[in-house]
Amino acid sequence: EYFYFKSDSAPEILDRGGYFDLCPLDRGSELRRNTIFALQDMGIHVEYSHHEVAPSQHEIDLRYDEALRMADNTQTYRIAVKEIARQNGVYATFMPKPMFGCNGSGMHVHQSLFRGEKNEFFDAGDPYHLSRVAKCYIAGLLRYASDIVAITNQWVNSYKRLVPGYEAPVYISWARRNRSTMVRVPMYKPGKEKATRIEYR
């Protein structure tokens, strides 16, 4: 998630689009589209893109990949977003909470563990379809939350985002649908065992 602003001097919004607007209603959607084309030209696969909840807030979701390649793609993605915005005379920022009173931006990292072709997080016999490995993985994230947060929320501004009421992860807990937990487990869809994963918010 990121914001487009008219300049880098003040958080003056570029658009007033809404969450998942289907029709392009703003200048930001064209910038987002151009960014997607640039990423695809570099071999980075994009799964989804949409306007986010806050004014001038956008999201581009990359196709999952193995960890090191995903880290490289993420850095390239961030540079592409900022550079294409700059080329078009606007400013893009991944700052967690540039404006008071609206949702901030986070980097929600979807994670799973594979052994060969088998998703080690999936267990058909569990009510949540989560294996013991997945539950231990989640437990580890929750147990070491105060240590991990120093890496995932390294700026003072990061903590301005972590307040109740704005879909921010304010509870060291996990859930299926509650977006105020640190870890969210997307619902299992029959036939999609390989998609079993956790989302670190």
Predicted ranges, named:
Residues 1-201:
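Glycine-rich, acidic/polar active-site loops that bind/position phosphate-bearing ligands
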